[in-house]
Amino acid sequence: MALMTMVQALNRALDEEMAKDPRVVVLGEDVGKRGGVFLVTEGLLQKYGPDRVMDTPLSEAAIVGAALGMAAHGLRPVAEIQFADYIFPGFDQLVSQVAKLRYRSGGQFTAPLVVRMPSGGGVRGGHHHSQSPEAHFVHTAGLKVVAVSTPYDAKGLLKAAIRDEDPVVFLEPKRLYRSVKEEVPEEDYTLSIGKAALRREGKDLTLIGYGTVMPEVLQAAAELAKAGVSAEVLDLRTLMPWDYEAVMNSVAKTGRVVLVSDAPRHASFVSEVAATIAEDLLDMLLAPPIRVTGFDTPYPYAQDKLYLPTVTRILNAAKRALDY
């Protein structure tokens, strides 16, 4: 075991997979000489050379399109988009081509590639460096979507994504890149895509989150415990496919659920989970599902931490559910 930040865990995952499998290549803006804008790919160019670690032009369309071509010819590319906000110029390649290759070829071709994206706010990045666009990806059939919150999960799930036969959008909470450290196995391991993590057991209320907001979710659960409320905490980790069984089992047990995300509220991913809970567990709910999200505005430069779900907002939502 070694104490790692998320950046270090991601770097270790890439290094190990490149050493293990010569088909794994990395491409993106500044991923080579610079080591990536957040230094996730630091040292890989020196170790594996420019044929496997490729600096690209500033063109998301070209990055995703090139990754698809590489995947179709037998490589396993890991493409980096510097910020999730910048993926939109690459949407034609990602949505129209990458996501649909297996389906439109009748399974003759697959697209085993990963598109890594630093996502979310809390770093005073403003409206072009703070968005959480996961709803676009989960709505696109053919993509798997991962959203990690810990170094342990980051390493295990990135390795699983690289080995997956289908395209994976890998969302990394930039706010947690260096603010969280934990012990991470130095040996090889993977985690299952599609499986949530039970972070805390409880019986009175379920709190569900992923990615950027998980520190606030866990802190809210700790505050509720001081007040005698036993909150169960689920970290989804994967948004497509999301862990239906874990969510339903937890909410059926507690009868109350608060869903937390830093994405805008309208048509958010947690809205889909809330709707599914309401449809399938209506007769077991003691209160309606409650969402705590970002706001339906562009992400602000000033006071960006007030845009994020706060512990106070989560506690207020929990109180509404408990008092219903």
UniProtKB/Swiss-Prot annotation:
The enzyme class is oxidoreductase
Binding of thiamine diphosphate occurs at 29, 58-60, 82, 86-89
A Pfam entry, by short name: Transketolase_C
Name the domain of life: Bacteria
Q: Where does substrate bind?
A: 83-86, 129
Record keywords: Oxidoreductase, Thiamine pyrophosphate
| Listed GO MF terms | 3-methyl-2-oxobutanoate dehydrogenase (2-methylpropanoyl-transferring) activity
Matching entries from InterPro entries are given as: THDP-binding, Transketo_C/PFOR_II, Transketolase-like_Pyr-bd, Transketolase_C
In the UniProt record, does the keyword Oxidoreductase occur? Answer: yes
Known catalysed reaction(s)? Answer: N(6)-[(R)-lipoyl]-L-lysyl-[protein] + 3-methyl-2-oxobutanoate + H(+) = N(6)-[(R)-S(8)-2-methylpropanoyldihydrolipoyl]-L-lysyl-[protein] + CO2
What is the recorded function of this protein according to its Swiss-Prot or TrEMBL entry? Answer: The branched-chain alpha-keto dehydrogenase complex catalyzes the overall conversion of alpha-keto acids to acyl-CoA and CO(2). It contains multiple copies of three enzymatic components: branched-chain alpha-keto acid decarboxylase (E1), lipoamide acyltransferase (E2) and lipoamide dehydrogenase (E3).
Q: How does it assemble?
A: Heterotetramer of two alpha and two beta chains. Directly associated with ODBA in the E1 complex.
Q: Kindly provide the name given to this protein in its UniProt entry.
A: 2-oxoisovalerate dehydrogenase subunit beta
Organism expressing this protein natively? Thermus thermophilus (strain ATCC BAA-163 / DSM 7039 / HB27)
Output the lineage of the source organism: Bacteria, Thermotogati, Deinococcota, Deinococci, Thermales
